[in-house]
Every structure is written in structure tokens, then in C-alpha cells.
Amino acid sequence: FSIIVFFPTFKKDFGFFDEDLPACEDYDYWLRYSAKEDVIFIDEPLIIKKGGHSDQLSGVHWGMDRFRIRSLEKLLNEPGIKLVHKNDAIREVILKLAILINGSQKRKKFAYADSMLQKKQYWENILMRDEDD
């Protein structure tokens, strides 16, 4: 399990986890946080990550990147997002959509793959437009 201790100002500034997301709530939260605050990366492992437990949500929901894409798109609709953060988020959406498209095609979910391909092309066009400006 994961534990996070919040300062009282966190709720006012960033809210809490998005409970409408069936999974990836922590991903969504830290996206919102890191879009507004500087994050320092420590180049030393401080945790031991273990996966594959039967009670993990990744075993319950297929295509976990669907929820990450949703979080990224939600971030992209936030007012005042800096262009550098916006373009980084768009690149990540494109990457996650490519993974989702590949997995959908592998599982013969062609209609879903096509709809994700259209979404990917939309974001690629937005990114090209922003980079041309």
C-alpha cells in the first residue's frame, strides 16, 4: 500500500485524489502537483517497488493507460498551464495512445484502436501547431 502525508495547504492548492478515476488516482494527483510546483528528483532509490499482487487495480482494469490519458487530457484543459508543460503532456498522451493502440490491435479491438488513432492524430496536430508557433 502507499501512504502520503499532506500539508493542510495541499487540499486548497491541488485538491485530493480524483475519486471519479477507477485507477491511477495517484498519477493524476502528481501530474497536477508537478505542473504547478518544482519537483526535485533524488537519484537514489528510497523505496522497493513490488508488483503483481492479486489485489492491485492493474489486475482489475485492462488498459491502465486509458486512465493516464484521461488524467493528462484533464491537465491539458487546466487554465494557465505553461506551454512547456502542455507540450510535454501532449507528447506523453501520444506515447500512451500508441501503447493503447498497439494493445488494442493485438487483442483485435480494431474499432477501439481506430478511435484511439484518431485521438492520437488530433494531439499530434495540436503539438505540431504549438511547435510551429
Predicted features along the sequence, with ranges:
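Catalytic core of nucleotide-sugar-dependent glycosyltransferases
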Residues: 44-52, 58-83, 111-126
